[in-house]
Curated annotation (Swiss-Prot):
Coiled-coil region(s): 65-121, 171-263
Name of the molecule in the record: Putative ankyrin repeat domain-containing protein 20A12 pseudogene
Domain of life of the source: Eukaryota
Pfam family, one: CCDC144C
Organism in which the protein naturally occurs: Homo sapiens (Human)
Keyword Coiled coil among record annotations: yes
Keyword vocabulary terms for this entry: Coiled coil
Length: 263
């Protein structure tokens, strides 16, 4: 009888010890619960990171479109600038040609005036010779030659004067064109500045896109890590849950057996 009592008491003590182990295990699980909840929160945050990645990808597409637009605008400005440079070169060449023509006409005018001056004295003498023709006996042939030369010089002088007038008009037109070309040159310089600004903006966009690509790569890597950690956390939770279920079931069966034996 005493032996049966001692056996029953041992079984009760064993059951009490098993219950203590169960309570200790439950307490341990309660301590692990915050860590598991954090892992679950990471799983929920995964969707937020997906949205961030989507927004960044959308930003890449918009940046690419803007980059193409800036490149098209840059090409257009470069074509306009080349056209203006070609026009400016053409006007500069015409200016140089006109300068040569002006110098030639000025030289011709100077030569004509020089010849006219040289003939002024003989012409004065010619008038005197007309009055005293019989006394001086100047040959009529020489007089005719001098008068013919004088007429030729007058015609040449009129031609040079007409050329000078026309040249002055052309020079005025050219000055107006030159003024217009200065404005064109200023516009060309402004286009060059716009081109430089566009090139800087394109460079900044490319740098931004490169940095964004690095950031996207990091986000994708972080997303993969989160996915893996979330999967591991879920698997661990399922494994712990199955182990706890099996252990609890085993302990419950053992406890039922012990209670039956006590009775």
């Amino acid at each position: 009888m005493k032996e049966m009592y001692e056996n029953a008491e041992d079984k009760v003590n064993n059951s009490t010890g098993k219950w203590s182990c169960v309570e200790e295990r439950i307490c341990h699980l309660q301590h692990e619960n915050p860590c598991i909840e954090q892992q679950l929160d990471d799983v929920h945050q995964k969707e937020d990171h997906k949205e961030i990645v989507t927004n960044i990808q959308r930003g890449f597409i918009e940046s690419g479109k803007k980059d193409l637009m800036l490149e098209e605008k840059n090409k257009k400005l470069m074509n306009e600038c080349d056209h203006l440079k070609e026009s400016l070169f053409q006007y500069e060449r015409e200016k140089a040609e006109r300068v040569v023509v002006v110098r030639q006409l000025q030289q011709e005018a100077a030569d004509s005036l020089k010849k006219l001056t040289m003939l002024e004295s003989p012409l004065e003498g010619i008038s005197h010779y007309h009055i005293n023709l019989d006394e001086t006996q100047v040959p009529k042939k020489k007089l005719f030659q001098v008068e013919s030369q004088f007429d030729d010089l007058m015609v040449e002088k009129e031609a040079v004067s007409s050329k000078c007038v026309n040249l002055a008009k052309e020079n005025q037109v050219f000055q107006q064109k030159l003024l217009s070309m200065k404005k064109v040159q200023q516009e060309c310089e402004k286009l060059e500045e716009d081109k430089k600004m566009l090139e800087e903006e394109i460079l900044n966009l490319k740098t931004h896109m490169e940095n964004s690509m690095v950031e996207l790569s990091k986000l994708q890597e972080y997303k993969s890590e989160l996915d893996e950690r979330a999967m591991q956390a879920v698997e661990k939770l399922e494994e712990i849950h199955l182990q706890e279920q099996a252990q609890y079931k085993k302990q419950l069966e053992q406890l039922n057996k012990d209670i039956i034996q006590l009775h």
